[in-house]
């Protein structure tokens, strides 16, 4: 008798054979195209999808000196550098000449995507997933939807538009965007903001590269603390724009309060070029804190350590050199607290990177959905420096709790890799594709097994015919 068994492994409606991805964004992976977290998101998400085996096309405002089209990752990832003829007159990055680029983007991109990617893929029986990022792509996404409608192809494409922040929300035609795309965002905090606008976006979190889960060299961690001559004191770190929203004043005021307690403390501060930095450092001096600039033109770990050692006498070290990811991870791991808090944070990637390094993240209480107070970090609810002070005193008095928090932080970060984010995205795309009836449900795979008794009978029967 034949035994029938159904396979219960997870079955995907969206597969690498039946789906093509298109990502539309102003920012991208070129240094010319990077202006913030959006370019990093687009680069990491597209690479994660391509690594999974999906064909991926990325359209962005690329470096005018690089090829207009570049094929990567074994042909699975294609970079399309758009508006290069305009960018050559605007050498200062992606947002230099933004309005001119935006006009050309809206006029030329939708037709190209529909004619050269979407329509051919749909003709082959494939689903097309088109993902737009930030306000600059809203008009283009709506036009893509309209062009697909005109060709009778709209139900074979899933269009998601994602809000990473609230920048230029006033420039978006929300009625049209909501009709032509499925709106998404990166955290429940952003979802709640958009609820107030009559929108109900899907939440698809950001991620971090899986490589950031690798352990940080403890020898480098010890070396950093030795360079700071901290002698059992408290190291705080903050990496953010010089922006009032990032609560820099709270950071320097917490250092002053720790000093008043008789605790030795140092703040490693890496800001940007914004003028608010002058105000923050002036406030630090008013509080009686010493400030030093750490500078180096060399780009290696030894020079970074040396630069910090030269400033170790200061209470606040203003880091004036670029911090590559490998050195950032050492700072995150070596610090007693990484102040990743702000008054408005759509997601909070610094807090998650800190967790991945085994650091102690002090996040805000806005978009950092991954943070659980006293479990994998600390969640600051106010702008009062006494809150930071209190948590640091707690960690000093209960060092075992700090160790537990660091361990849980690493476990949490493992759930927020770009691979996990891509998997989440695919699940949401599948749901929408089913609503559009763009996916045909397949029956579970059936496997037949032959029992030993049946096999013996079959062999006997075969032998009798020989």
Regions found by a protein language model. Name each.
Residues 2-21, 48-128, 297-314:
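A conserved catalytic-core segment of Leloir-type glycosyltransferases
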Residues 225-246, 252-255, 268-270:
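Conserved donor-binding/catalytic core segment of Leloir-type glycosyltransferases
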Residues 277-326:
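Nucleotide-activated donor-binding/catalytic signature segment of Leloir-type glycosyltransferases, i.e.
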Residues 330-335:
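Short alpha-helical donor nucleotide-sugar binding micro-motif in glycosyltransferases
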Residues 343:
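Aromatic "clamp/platform" in nucleotide-sugar-dependent glycosyltransferases that forms part
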Residues 356-364:
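Short hydrophobic beta-strand element within catalytic cores of glycosyltransferases
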Residues 374, 378-385, 394-399:
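Conserved acidic donor-binding segment of nucleotide-sugar-dependent glycosyltransferases
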Residues 400-437, 443-446:
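A charged, aromatic-enriched C-terminal amphipathic alpha-helix characteristic of glycosyltransferases
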């Amino acid at each position: 008798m034949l035994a029938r068994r159904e396979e219960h492994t997870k079955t995907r409606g969206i597969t690498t054979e039946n789906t093509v991805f298109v990502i539309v964004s102003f920012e991208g992976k070129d240094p010319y195209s990077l202006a913030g977290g959006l370019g990093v998101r687009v680069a990491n998400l597209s690479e994660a999808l391509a690594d999974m085996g999906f064909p991926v096309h990325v359209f962005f405002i690329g470096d005018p000196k690089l090829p207009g089209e570049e094929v990567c990752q074994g042909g699975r990832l294609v970079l399309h550098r758009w508006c290069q003829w305009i960018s050559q007159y605007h050498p200062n990055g992606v947002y230099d000449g933004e309005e001119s680029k935006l006009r050309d983007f809206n006029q030329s991109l939708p037709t190209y995507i529909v004619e050269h990617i979407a329509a051919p893929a749909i003709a082959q029986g494939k689903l097309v997933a088109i993902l737009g990022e930030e306000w600059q792509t809203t008009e283009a996404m709506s036009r893509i939807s309209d062009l697909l409608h005109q060709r009778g192809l709209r139900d074979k494409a899933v269009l998601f538009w994602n809000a990473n922040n609230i920048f230029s929300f006033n420039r978006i035609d929300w009625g049209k965007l909501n009709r032509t795309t499925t709106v998404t965002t990166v955290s429940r905090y952003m979802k709640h903001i958009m609820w107030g606008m009559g929108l109900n976006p899907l939440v698809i979190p950001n991620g971090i590269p899986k490589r950031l889960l690798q352990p940080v060299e403890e020898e480098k961690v010890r070396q950093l603390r030795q360079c700071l001559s901290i002698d059992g004191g408290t190291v705080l770190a903050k990496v953010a724009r010089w922006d009032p929203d990032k609560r820099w004043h709270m950071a320097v005021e917490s250092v002053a309060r720790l000093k008043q307690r008789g605790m030795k403390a140092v703040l490693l501060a890496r800001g940007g070029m914004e003028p608010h930095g002058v105000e923050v450092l002036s406030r630090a001096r008013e509080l009686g804190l010493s400030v030093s600039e750490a500078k180096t033109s060399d780009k290696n770990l030894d020079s970074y350590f040396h630069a910090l050692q030269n400033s170790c006498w200061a209470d606040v070290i203003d880091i004036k050199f670029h911090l590559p990811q490998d050195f950032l991870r050492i700072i995150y791991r070596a610090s007693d607290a990484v102040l990743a808090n702000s008054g408005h944070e759509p997601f909070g990637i610094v807090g998650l990177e800190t967790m991945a390094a085994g650091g102690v993240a002090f996040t805000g209480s806005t978009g950092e959905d991954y943070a659980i107070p006293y479990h994998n970090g600390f969640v600051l609810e106010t702008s009062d420096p006494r809150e930071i002070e209190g948590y640091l005193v707690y960690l000093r008095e209960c060092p075992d709790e700090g160790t537990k928090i660091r361990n849980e932080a690493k476990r949490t970060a493992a759930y927020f890799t770009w691979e996990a984010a891509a998997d989440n995205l695919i699940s949401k795309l599948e749901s929408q594709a089913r609503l559009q009836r763009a996916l045909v449900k397949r029956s579970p795979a059936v496997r037949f097994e032959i029992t030993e008794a049946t096999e013996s009978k079959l062999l006997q029967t075969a032998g009798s015919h020989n």
